[in-house]
């Protein structure tokens, strides 16, 4: 076991509190209340201006429970040297977090092969690399809001939609050589050789267009709009580039083929009780989110980091934006998410588990059996609980029982997935960790937090009609997962842990994995935590701003 100074979280604990991390006693009511926070003082100054201008009350930190009775601690963004205030990790205060979701929501992938077949067989058009390049030129005019077919059509200012474009993905290397470089997401260039081979083989000779709609449209409309926006501009661009007459009988077939036949959304439509269309957070499966994150191609030999970056992205999207805002609202559930991507506590636990597994079994070399699940999950859970007991500062950092339960279980689940290369085994390791934790501490958190964990083992080891999906295909709307914070992002990380251990280039969909390797995306999906830190420091430059059409100040 590593010494205290070697713990990955020790630097953060020493920065956060004046006392030694091992100290059992602290002080209260001596820190100056909310005024100990520079950010809250800034908030109060702004609120006072707003109240003076409009005469209606606004933010007032003296309302409600007095803030600052305890130390208002800083947070170290895990995997970085950046310390920030907690307020800067609320997604409304963090432009990078917003852009991560914007870049996922505004992405729609549409296969081109069916449309090409209809063009050739029903409309008598020739499809060549040259015509594909011409079509892509047209689409990159139309997608950001340019008119292509009719006169007297209003258009959108390019400065508002500068982040909007379309590119091509193909596993056909001969075709890839003929596609203009500015339109191609080049698999061989962007991925390590072994991963590139896997992706090219999985995609085969199929061709896809990746459409990135304008961020600003997502701010005004919803995720389902992206699918419709892409469909309309694709159809108009095909009609223009291939000079299709609107009155031809086959055009209706072509319209379906080009707009709807091969659509890949990032999120599926939710049922009426959730009332959300495609490309909203509640419909994004865990495996799809894992494929959006690109850490695996940058750090292929570090499965722990790969899993941790996915957990961070998932916790932000599922806990902060989906459950914390769409399903709850207001201040939301920020600190359920921050527990897994700040202060290096989860990092310490996950790397401990990786080392344990590597020494005892080898990475992805153990059979996915209950014996392995019990061994690995128990070892890592007990290690995590011991750290909380040994270092009260870690307990204060994760002041909620459900935060600690999520962190221990995430480490146990990822470690089990590292051992077996199997996400279902990893999920069962998560469930076992929760049960062990409850036995040790009596409870896990708020009432109902552990609902899905109490009944989860049965449906992680068998396939049942309504509850038996493999973890890769489950998502926030899966039965029992629909309103439980501190779980969903970690599940995505367990998926990634299994596939990273196996050396897989993707978790669910090779085309989605390649789509998010695109270097023109605003958010850097190889390093979500570093991007969150930039957002917290107010150094991240987002898309979707309206400066061009508002008065200059």
UniProtKB/Swiss-Prot annotation:
GO terms for biological process: methanogenesis. Coenzyme F430 binds at residue 150. It comes from the Archaea. Its cofactor is coenzyme F430. Its EC number is 2.8.4.1. This is Methyl-coenzyme M reductase I subunit alpha. Its main location: cytoplasm. Coenzyme B binds at residues 259, 273. It is found in: Cytoplasm. One of its GO terms (molecular function) is coenzyme-B sulfoethylthiotransferase activity. Binds 2 coenzyme F430 non-covalently per MCR complex. Coenzyme F430 is a yellow nickel porphinoid. Methyl-coenzyme-M reductase is activated when the enzyme-bound coenzyme F430 is reduced to the Ni(I) oxidation state. InterPro entries: Me_CoM_Rdtase_asu (IPR016212), Me_CoM_Rdtase_asu/bsu_C (IPR008924), Me_CoM_Rdtase_asu_C (IPR009047), Me_CoM_Rdtase_asu_N (IPR003183), Me_CoM_Rdtase_asu_N_sub1 (IPR015811), Me_CoM_Rdtase_asu_N_sub2 (IPR015823), Me_CoM_Rdtase_Fd-like_fold (IPR009024).
